[in-house]
Every structure is written in structure tokens, then in C-alpha cells.
UniProtKB/Swiss-Prot annotation:
CDD domains: Ribosomal_L13. Pfam families: Ribosomal_L13. The lineage of its organism: Bacteria, Pseudomonadati, Pseudomonadota, Betaproteobacteria, Neisseriales. It comes from Laribacter hongkongensis (strain HLHK9). This is Large ribosomal subunit protein uL13. Keywords: Ribonucleoprotein, Ribosomal protein.
Amino acid sequence: MKTFSAKPHEVKRDWFVVDATDKVLGRLAAEIARRLRGKHKPEYTPHVDTGDYIVVVNADKLRVTGNKALDKKYYRHSGYPGGIYERTFTELQNEFPERVLEKAVKGMLPKGPLGYAMIKKLKVYAGAEHPHTAQQPKALEI
């Protein structure tokens, strides 16, 4: 019996919608990253993108445990000397609620071309509405 290896054109991808209301950021991001990679499928192959599409709604209602709302920092740099910017979780959540979950999931995916393809299958929305009803996403309870 030969070892099965998934081919990119044979992969069947499903669409799932996840409600992030009152979910803990890290636990939700870990499960989303697992499903974007396709590790929940028996035909998982490390060098092939076998994951599903994930639509996350209510990203503005995510929560973190402990004192991370004030202690967790997000950094970015302009490229110029002294051009570092710092925001807390609460500041980023208020201004760009989608970005918090996107950054958490992106850090859990592989770096390189395969990881970039995987993160494109993640769709995050702050409110309860999303424009992907034509794909008929199934509700996923995490």
C-alpha cells in the first residue's frame, strides 16, 4: 500500500462560518489555523494546501484572558530610524477589530508561499454580516 499524497487539483474545500462572540483569541486562532492548513482532514499533506475557507464574524467581540487587554502590544515599523509604533490590544481592537485575529492566525501558519496561500482563505468581519452567503458556508462551533 502506497502512502497517500494529496494533489492540489484534487483537494475539496468547504466554507465554514465561525462566530467569534466571547471566544478567547488564542484558542480560536489555533483552531482556525489548524483548519486553514487542513490538518483536520485525513488527506492532509504538509506540502499541499488542503485547508478549508473560514469566514469569521463578530471579530469585534473577541476577548483575551488576564490583563492582556492592556499588556499585549502590537508593534510595526515605518522603516525610518525611530519609526516604531506600538498599540495595545484594546487600541487595535477598537480601531481595526479584524486585524487582531488575522495577526494571531497568520503567526500560527507556515512562513513562505504555502502560508501566504493559506491566509488568503481566511475572511474576517467585525460585524455579524458577511458577503459570502453565495458559498453557503456551514456553521462551525469552536
